[in-house]
Amino acid sequence: APSGSGNQLVCNSGTISNLVATGTSILWYANTTGGSPLNPTTALVNGTTYYASQTLSSCESRNRYQLAVTITNPALPTSAGNQSVCQTNPIQTLIPVATSPDGGTITWYNAPTGGSLIAAPTWNTIGSTTFYAQNNNNSCTSTARTPVTLEIKAAPLLTITNTTCAANLLTYS
């Protein structure tokens, strides 16, 4: 029979083709004995045990390796909301805030998918930008990212026109 850890964590979803066992020509089954091999595109079910055989020299093993599957789906990060403030002097620095509802850690990116990791996102420029929070839990990541927009509005310029009036002095008697 093939070998392995006995347990496998799968992120978000998966298929039979995502299962891992050490051996040659692995076939996966839903039962410890008998049955037909599962199609590699069969969706995995959380908490289900799958069974693997291997084929050597055209002979399939009678014993099957047992693998328990846990599917983890990290929740979307929860945002503290967008921030929009008016410029102060000196200009302030805004920091996006998001938390993991399931105890994971938050990483920040500059795009909703792909993009670059931003280790410590801040904004201290007139205008706006959006950072994207991703939840990481059990070596898995949330399927989407939560946007947080930071904006600093330019302070209005106050223009004062200095008008001087000529004084006409009056004498009363």
Segments from the language model and where they lie:
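Proline- and Ser/Thr-rich low-complexity, intrinsically disordered segments
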Residues: 1-173
